[in-house]
């Protein structure tokens, strides 16, 4: 069962399951007292304890108040639904205007784009190409980890790869999670049946291997964490688990091209937990032409220092017509229109959205970390924002301008 929830200050309707709830606990306690409300699932992160309560029908206000009044309960909220935010020698590099904009490769049928309105990737690669020590979680619809342009830069869980089949060799609660995890089906195969996550992964770190395209990073380790189903939607429960998994394996960057829910204290808490570990959370600003200063778009507009909110620009250097914006809540822009990248089933495709702009920023941050691994997340955030290209067309829409990889590495 799904219902629409409208929250004051949120532009779009909030989707949530009417028979599924997330309960934050104040400590480790017996779950038996909650079983009268429905089926109980425990969700534990590094420092947080949650329960999911699945009921046959919606809980009444009286029942919800009974849960809230429990001395061991911090809060209870609906299990919300999130969705994707999309609308060189490598033979298809010429199609990647976001990396090198010639004008001809970035415009529409009747008009060209503008030369140079890109992230200066070619000049950036003269300074840094990436590093296998940088781990980036792609929290999305999964990734086609067998794609020939991605396979070299996919993370492998060495403990499980070299361990015993059917055994949780690394003791993290997930059996045989060699390639990451599918939190939709709760299994060890995060293969992408949608294509969105694979597209994002290619933007970050498609190999520079004379096949297809190039990602921002020549070398990296990308971890596919699938919490969005093949139809592009996922739950608060899945988001919590995916973010917690990424935190526990020690990623440096989480790339998040999704959103659409209202404020969730549980989601805030688990992102804050990642912040406490020094992890950057790059988030799509949204695609509803929305002023995020007035109408929040989560998770991008949570007031947390590790979040970098990304809007989308077009081939002429303007704000993409669909992109959300916000002078105080959108940190910077990156190309997000007709972005050519890897896709499911070992293919390639153009997609548009703040979903596409987000992994560009994740990839630039990965290059910056490769160059200066001593910088903390606050220093990296400040540096990427201070090094943006300024323009009148974007100046009123974000804190900074458009991301520039070369300047960020200088």
Where are these regions (language model features)?
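Extracellular S/T/G-rich loop segment that most often corresponds to the catalytic His/Ser-adjacent loop
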Residues: 279, 297-374, 378-382, 408
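Loop/turn elements at helix/coil->beta-strand transitions in domains of secreted/extracellular proteins
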Residues: 72, 132-135, 218-223, 248-254, ...
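Solvent-exposed loop/turn segments at secondary-structure junctions
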Residues: 29-30, 57-60, 80-84, 141-145, ...
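Classical Sec-dependent N-terminal signal peptides that target proteins to the secretory pathway
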Residues: 1-18
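Protease zymogen maturation seam
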Residues: 68-135, 143-153, 238, 398-401
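Active-site-proximal loop motif in hydrolases
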Residues: 103-146, 158-212, 225-236, 292-295, ...
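Inhibitory N-terminal propeptides of secreted protease zymogens
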Residues: 17-98, 123, 251, 270, ...
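C-terminal subdomain of the subtilisin-like protease fold in secreted/lumenal serine endopeptidases
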Residues: 214, 238, 247-258, 264-270, ...
């Amino acid at each position: 069962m799904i219902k629409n929830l409208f929250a004051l200050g949120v532009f779009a309707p909030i989707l949530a399951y009417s028979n599924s709830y997330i309960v934050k606990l104040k400590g480790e306690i017996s779950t038996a007292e909650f079983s009268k409300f429905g089926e109980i699932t425990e969700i534990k992160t590094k420092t947080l304890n949650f329960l999911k309560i699945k009921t046959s029908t919606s809980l009444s206000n009286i029942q919800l108040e009974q849960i809230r009044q429990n001395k061991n309960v911090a809060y209870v909220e609906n299990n919300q639904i999130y969705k994707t935010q999309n609308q060189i020698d490598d033979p298809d590099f010429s199609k990647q205007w976001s990396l090198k904009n010639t004008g001809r490769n970035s415009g529409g049928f009747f008009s060209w784009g503008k030369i140079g309105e890109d992230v200066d990737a070619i000049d950036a690669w003269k300074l840094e190409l990436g590093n296998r020590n940088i781990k980036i979680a792609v929290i999305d619809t999964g990734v086609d980890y067998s794609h020939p342009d991605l396979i070299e830069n996919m993370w492998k869980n060495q403990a499980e790869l070299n361990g015993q089949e059917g055994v949780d060799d690394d003791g993290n609660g997930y059996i045989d999670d060699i390639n990451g995890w599918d939190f939709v089906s709760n299994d060890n195969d995060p293969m992408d049946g949608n294509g969105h996550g694979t597209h994002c992964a290619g933007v970050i770190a498609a190999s520079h291997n004379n096949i297809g395209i190039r990602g921002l990073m020549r070398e990296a380790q990308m971890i596919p964490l699938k919490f969005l189903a093949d139809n592009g939607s996922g739950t608060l429960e899945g988001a919590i688990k995916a973010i917690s998994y990424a935190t526990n394996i020690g990623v440096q960057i989480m790339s998040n091209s999704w959103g659409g829910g209202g404020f969730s204290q549980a989601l805030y808490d688990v992102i804050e937990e990642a912040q406490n570990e020094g992890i950057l959370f790059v988030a799509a600003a949204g695609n509803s032409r929305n002023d995020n200063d007035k109408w929040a778009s989560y998770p991008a507009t949570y007031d947390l220092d590790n979040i970098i909110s990304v809007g989308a620009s077009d081939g002429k250097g303007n704000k993409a017509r669909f992109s959300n914006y916000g002078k105080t809540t959108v940190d910077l822009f990156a190309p997000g229109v007709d972005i050519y990248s890897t896709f499911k089933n070992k293919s390639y495709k153009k997609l548009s959205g703040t979903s596409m702009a987000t992994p560009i920023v994740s990839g630039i941050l990965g290059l910056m970390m490769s160059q200066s691994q001593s910088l903390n997340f606050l220093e990296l955030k400040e540096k990427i924002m201070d090094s943006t290209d300024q323009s009148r067309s974007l100046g009123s829409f974000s804190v900074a301008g458009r991301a520039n990889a070369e300047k960020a590495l200088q």
